[in-house]
Structure formats: structure tokens, C-alpha cells
Amino acid sequence: MNKYDRLDEITKLVNKRGSVRTNEIVEDLNVSDMTVRRDLAELEEKGVLTKIHGGARSNSAFQYKEMSHQEKHTRFIEEKRFIAKNAVDLIEDGDTIFLGPGTTVQKLAEEINHYSLTIITNCLPVFNILIKKQTLHFRVYLLGGEMRDLTEAFVGEMTNQLLSQLRFSKMFFSSNGVKDGLAMTSSIEEAYTQQIALSHSLEKYLLIDSSKIGKDDFSSFCELRELNAVLTDNNDLEKKEKIESYVEVIS
């Protein structure tokens, strides 16, 4: 096996398992310990993985360092726009909708152009887009509370009390990662607020680009089996198939 094939195999191993020990790579690829260590060092330099004691962990599978709203805003723009265009087709005049935080949901807000809707959100950037479209029949509400600087989403007791009194025909939301049939986020507070909204929504749709599939994060907040559908892109059919074992996928 040449070096480039070996690097490719190690990348596949660590991304599939999340983390892998050096001796496992030695056995799987039938190469020396020293060769594996050199390969891991090279892959770490390329940003593919992070070396840990006795092995390495995937930089694709772990998402514990949360990116800011601005950082996320510049990533996978076309994929998010593709997802948003599919999501807007699920919205009907007369719906009462909850929109969660996230840049993919923000793209959906840009696409919404209906005559008669009631939209509630706890995300300031989403609200700022929609409030410009408000009319007598197109009503937009922002739930207040404590704002998280990273995501510009309102959370906490005040937000949750307001949310607990409301009911929605549809909810559109995103997550930082999806793994083992669970949607995950970096904040317990955001997770709890999302759970309340989910429990008060008749139809529930998760919007995620395929880079998030297989990624772990700090707090899980819903099972994919509880959702009506997951909307994603077509960049990685293998990842999409993983989701299809739990829920309908729209792409």
C-alpha cells in the first residue's frame, strides 16, 4: 500500500469510528508503528485529525468547539440555500411556524414569501430578516430572554415560559451535529428551548447540510425518529443513507 492510499485509509478509519488507537491502525493496515505515527502527524498538519494519547480523533466527528454565527454564515452557503428552497415548499399560507436558530434556518427565512403566516423565532438574525416582510397577515414575533452571543439565540427561563404557552403547526430547526439517530447542539440551554418547541409542534423538520452528519456534540435534544423529515444536500450519499435508516430525507 502506497503512502497516499494509506493516508486515505487512515482518514476513513478515524472518521468512521470517531477516534482510533495507533495499534488498531497498525493491525488494520499491516504497517509499522513508526509509519502510523508519521502518517498521523501529517494528517494532523492537514487538519484531518487531532493526535491524542495512543491514537487520534477525527476533526469531522467532533464539534465541541462551537463556531459563532458569523463563522457559520460563510460555510456551505450553496448547500444551505438548496436546503432552504426545499424547506419553503413545505410551508403553506395559514401556518403558525417556529423557526429555531441557525444559518440554514436563516436561509429559509430569506426564501419565505407567503401572504398569510404567523412566525415565531428565538433567533435575532432570523427575526431581522422576517420583520421586513411583516404585513397585516404576515406576523413575526421574537421571543426574548437571555441572548447567547455565539448564536444570537434567546434562551433561558423567560424564553421557555413564553414558548411553553405557544403551539405551532410546523417547526424548522437545525443542529450542530447528527449522530446515532440524535440531533445535537453545543448548549444545554439551547437544547432545552428546542425541546420545548418540538413538543409543541405538529410537524417537525430538521435542516442540516451533510457536513454535520456523523458529527458529535455536547447535548442531544431530539431523536430523528420523532421528526417528519430531515432536509439535507446531495453532497454525500453515504451520509444521507445513514439518516434514511431513521427518518424520511428530503434532498
UniProtKB/Swiss-Prot annotation:
BP GO terms, sorted: lactose metabolic process
Pfam families with a match to the protein in the record: DeoRC, HTH_DeoR
Domain of life: Bacteria
HTH deoR-type domain mapped to chain residues: 3-58
Keyword Zinc-finger included in the entry's annotation: no
One example GO MF annotation: DNA binding
InterPro entries per UniProt: Carb_Metab_HTH_regulators, DeoR-like_C, DeoR_HTH, NagB/RpiA_transferase-like, Tscrpt_reg_HTH_DeoR_CS, WH-like_DNA-bd_sf, WH_DNA-bd_sf
Record SMART domains: DeoRC, HTH_DEOR
Keyword vocabulary terms for this entry: DNA-binding, Lactose metabolism, Repressor, Transcription, Transcription regulation
DNA-binding region: 20-39
Keyword Membrane: no
Protein role: Repressor of the lactose catabolism operon. Galactose-6-phosphate is the inducer.
UniProt protein name: Lactose phosphotransferase system repressor
Organism field: Staphylococcus epidermidis (strain ATCC 35984 / DSM 28319 / BCRC 17069 / CCUG 31568 / BM 3577 / RP62A)
Protein encoded by which gene: lacR
